Design a protein with these regions (language model features):
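ABC ATPase C-loop
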Residues: 151-152
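Catalytic Walker B motif of ABC-type/P-loop ATPase nucleotide-binding domains
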Residues: 159-163
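Conserved ABC ATPase signature
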Residues: 134-138, 142
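ABC ATPase NBD coupling module
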Residues: 56, 68-88, 113, 117, ...
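The feature captures the beta-strand-to-loop junction immediately N-terminal to the Walker
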Residues: 37-39
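Helix-to-loop junction immediately C-terminal to a conserved catalytic motif
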Residues: 52
């Protein structure tokens, strides 16, 4: 029997008076990779922020590893092994690549460390070549690699990637997808948001589509490939 790492039920989340999430149920099992899809403004990032405690839901419940974390601060969610790579990246530009990674390791969960400093550098050879570069000296793609590398240094059980390849050149985007495959093979659960549904569904086990803050589809990648009308209807592709 699989272990449910995230179990969110009946989420209603608002920005001021704007009702964004409308009764969303969302779950993540151990070792599962999930694609979260939807057009712009449909609630994807809001759902991720609700899971992380950044934008607490007004109604509903978020359970992490069986513990009720609804409305708890993000650092408490992170301590339970959930790492969040937000859209727009989040590195310390005045610190070197090495310092960024070392700092993340100190903030990570205790116990066995599957993702060591050496393993991260092996996975991200570009970062290994730029250890003494400041974060602000890196390209957009390298900054994204550093952000993901920092998250892995915390040794998470769940990795959340919001707009994983947004604004990246095709060659760099392919490298990010390669890294996503490595992460999946390592056994980490992942939630991936990205506009490139073809790449997403090559990696994911299950996919969720949001429309106006409601779940309108949940199913396997194979189902989406077999029935393209679902993507056409809800994503316009």
């Amino acid at each position: 029997m699989s272990e449910r790492l995230i179990d969110a039920t009946g989420l209603h989340t608002y920005y001021g008076a704007s009702h964004i999430l409308r009764g969303v149920d969302f779950r993540v099992e151990r070792g599962e990779t999930i694609g979260l899809m939807g057009r712009n403004g449909m609630g994807k990032s809001t759902l991720l922020k609700s899971l992380m405690g950044l934008v607490p839901p007004r109604q509903g419940q978020v359970r992490i590893k069986g513990r009720d974390m609804t409305g708890r601060p993000p650092y408490e969610v992170a301590r339970l092994g959930v790492a969040y790579v937000p859209e727009g990246r989040g590195i310390f530009g005045n610190l070197s690549v090495q310092e960024n990674l070392r700092m993340a390791a100190r903030a990570g969960t205790q116990g066995q460390r599957d993702w060591t400093y050496e393993r991260v550098l092996t996975t991200f050879p570009r970062l290994a070549e730029r250890l003494r570069h400041g974060g602000q000296q890196l390209s957009g793609g390298e900054q994204q690699m550093l952000t993901i590398g920092r998250a892995l240094m915390t040794n998470p059980d769940v990795l959340i990637l919001d707009e994983a390849t947004e604004g990246l050149a095709p060659l760099i985007a392919r490298e990010i997808w390669r890294i996503c495959s490595v992460i999946k093979a390592s056994g980490i659960s992942a939630i991936i948001v990205d506009k490139n549904w073809k790449h997403v569904t090559q990696i994911t086990d299950r996919n969720v589509i949001l429309v106006k803050g409601e779940v309108v589809f949940e199913g396997s990648s194979q189902t989406l490939h077999d029935d393209p009308s679902v993507l056409e209807q809800h994503l316009g592709v």
